[in-house]
């Protein structure tokens, strides 16, 4: 097991709830603050707890997630909150976890989507910083195989925002 890393740090009840007399974990703290004080500059989850490092089998690689809310006016003049996230990762194995669309990015993007949906905010920008992205020698053959595969258009992104319903229908019919 990873010991006192990742899930243990997230689930540790260290914050005083603003809604009850209970202690809450890092996720509940983010949710509470997004509801009560969405412009708070302390909306972060930090897994790098120096006091517990000796009891972690691996120091957290993806160690910090910072949430920011911005209020933007849409094409209809309605101001809507958008949730932005920055994921900071100290170290990342390219093949296993840290490549674009990899395991780490997927996990944190899923968390981002879940929190935005729970609070009712639109998605803004998701940024993933990896400070030491590396490829191990044992994975070079895998990378060679990946590079030989022809490019496949796996995703189709719908442009937004649209000016008219007709543009939306046209784009949907083109997918």
What are these regions (language model features)?
Residues 1-175:
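Terminal, non-catalytic protein-protein interaction segments that mediate quaternary/complex assembly
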């Amino acid at each position: 097991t990873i010991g006192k890393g990742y899930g243990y740090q997230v689930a540790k009840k260290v914050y005083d709830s603003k809604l009850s007399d209970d202690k809450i974990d890092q996720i509940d703290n983010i949710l509470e603050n997004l509801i009560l004080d969405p412009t708070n500059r302390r909306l972060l989850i930090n897994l790098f707890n120096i006091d517990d490092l000796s009891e972690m089998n691996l120091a957290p690689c993806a160690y910090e997630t910072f949430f920011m809310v911005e209020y933007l006016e849409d094409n209809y003049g309605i101001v809507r909150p958008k949730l932005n996230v920055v994921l900071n990762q100290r170290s990342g194995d390219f093949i296993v976890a840290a490549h674009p669309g990899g395991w780490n990015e997927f996990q944190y993007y899923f968390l981002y989507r879940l929190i935005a949906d729970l609070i009712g905010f639109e998605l803004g920008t998701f940024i993933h910083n990896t400070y030491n992205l590396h490829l191990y020698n044992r994975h070079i053959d895998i990378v060679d195989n990946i590079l030989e595969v022809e490019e496949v258009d796996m995703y189709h992104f719908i442009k937004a925002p649209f000016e008219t319903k007709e543009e939306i229908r046209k784009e949907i019919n083109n997918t």
